Amino acid sequence: MLRRRGSPGMGVHVGAALGALWFCLTGALEVQVPEDPVVALVGTDATLCCSFSPEPGFSLAQLNLIWQLTDTKQLVHSFAEGQDQGSAYANRTALFPDLLAQGNASLRLQRVRVADEGSFTCFVSIRDFGSAAVSLQVAAPYSKPSMTLEPNKDLRPGDTVTITCSSYQGYPEAEVFWQDGQGVPLTGNVTTSQMANEQGLFDVHSILRVVLGANGTYSCLVRNPVLQQDAHSSVTITPQRSPTGAVEVQVPEDPVVALVGTDATLRCSFSPEPGFSLAQLNLIWQLTDTKQLVHSFTEGRDQGSAYANRTALFPDLLAQGNASLRLQRVRVADEGSFTCFVSIRDFGSAAVSLQVAAPYSKPSMTLEPNKDLRPGDTVTITCSSYRGYPEAEVFWQDGQGVPLTGNVTTSQMANEQGLFDVHSVLRVVLGANGTYSCLVRNPVLQQDAHGSVTITGQPMTFPPEALWVTVGLSVCLIALLVALAFVCWRKIKQSCEEENAGAEDQDGEGEGSKTALQPLKHSDSKEDDGQEIA
């Protein structure tokens, strides 16, 4: 346990010692803080909650409590051996002394500033040691935006106006959104700047440039991302002279189709009145959705291109009512709707669509596996076509023209220019012969790119190794059969010989018995003869 000796400045040394204990002790004492950041408004007071569970018989004389900045280890407030050591943080911090004995080690931070934002660590030491960090998120609401126009008088349809939206004294940096009267977001021709003052609070200035229509409402929304608080403001601009429809602007009904890398002409025309002078003409081309300026002609002078210097008018034809725009080196990103604004005494506008396209390359066909193919093998056929736009339609068919839709997987990926590379994979089981065709179609150009492959499966044949193995096995089998036949023949022959030998033995025994019987007959006959003689 740390003990305080000497001057009150010992609190700093206690903080250093506890900082060392951070690395040495196990933190058996459980210290609890909120998981979510504490959000505090600038100028208000904030409470950084911290608590621990005191053991029975706990005394404040045993408590050492340190609050410090987590990153810099700067001391904020300390309590040691039963005494509050006070604040080292501009005298703006305080503990809750009446609640310390209950385990409440929370810190009250007064008159919060932007610079206070960050992480604070609560160190608690009794017999054991514990610590935890809590985050402070500072915020300040933004003021209601003010809207200004430049120019702000004598406005006519077709004029270009700069609208500035300003909001002050907020924190952190704001998110700014513009939209028109129909709620459509406006992202083109917007410039936003944010600058912090001495207190760290931000002033926001967002500028939108638009071409006026008959009537227009423009809204600015400034959002505080921490407070999720929105500050709104809007302005409605009504030009002094409403359009009478005298200026009829004509554009094609169908989209203009242009190939990537070529030039496209977006046609727009109007009917000039007698005595018309180019000094009276205000002509604006802009993107319909985002209102981004593309090209302008004002008071008899071409103001040039604000579209990467790729646009031009037809100056020799303007006096005849030709307000067409030439767009050079078309890109995929150019696709969309362009609005042609014409203002003389009256006003008119119309929108024309640009459809970008790029033909697909002739498909290349690859096989996997690509050799030693036999009927019945499964083969993967890949059809690849490159640098087309928009996304392609892919069709497969066999040699008889039958569509193949099963086991087909197609992927399309755009490169940095927005052009698509197409890879379509077909898995098939080979027959004796097979032709497979891949068709890649551009839906805008209605252009088809074909590729095909004919696969002839090799007939079933035995390799030389298999033939020699078969011959060897056949010879071995024949030899085995011959050997078996020979053994059987020997067995049969031996059996026959044994039977013949047995038969001869029986015949010899029969003859011997007959010979033995014959002398008996002779003796009997002699006896008979002797009897007779007697």
UniProtKB/Swiss-Prot annotation:
Record's protein name = CD276 antigen
Q: Which residues carry this modification: Phosphoserine?
A: 525
Bias type Acidic residues, positions? 498-510
| Chain segments annotated as coiled-coil in the UniProt record | none
Signal peptide region? 1-28
Give tissue specificity per the record.
Ubiquitous but not detectable in peripheral blood lymphocytes or granulocytes. Weakly expressed in resting monocytes. Expressed in dendritic cells derived from monocytes. Expressed in epithelial cells of sinonasal tissue. Expressed in extravillous trophoblast cells and Hofbauer cells of the first trimester placenta and term placenta.
Q: Which residues lie on this side of the membrane: Extracellular?
A: 29-466
Give the family per the record.
Answer: Belongs to the immunoglobulin superfamily. BTN/MOG family.
Among its keywords, does the record have Disulfide bond? Answer: yes
Output one GO MF annotation.
signaling receptor binding
GO CC field? external side of plasma membrane; membrane
Q: Which residues lie on this side of the membrane: Cytoplasmic?
A: 488-534
Protein's membrane topology: Single-pass type I membrane protein
What is the originating organism of this protein?
Homo sapiens
Q: What else does the entry mention about this protein? A: B7-H3 locus underwent genomic duplication leading to tandemly repeated immunoglobulin-like V and C domains (VC domains). The dominantly expressed human B7-H3 isoform contains tandemly duplicated VC domains. In contrast, mouse B7-H3 transcript contains only one single VC domain form due to an exon structure corresponding to V domain-(pseudoexon C)-(pseudoexon V)-C domain. This duplication appearing in primates is suggested to be very recent supporting a model of multiple independent emergence of tandem VC repeats within human and monkey species.
Q: Which gene encodes it?
A: CD276
- Enumerate the transmembrane spans: 467-487
Lineage of origin: Eukaryota, Metazoa, Chordata, Craniata, Vertebrata
Ordered alphabetically, the record's keywords are: Disulfide bond, Glycoprotein, Immunoglobulin domain, Membrane, Phosphoprotein, Repeat, Signal, Transmembrane, Transmembrane helix
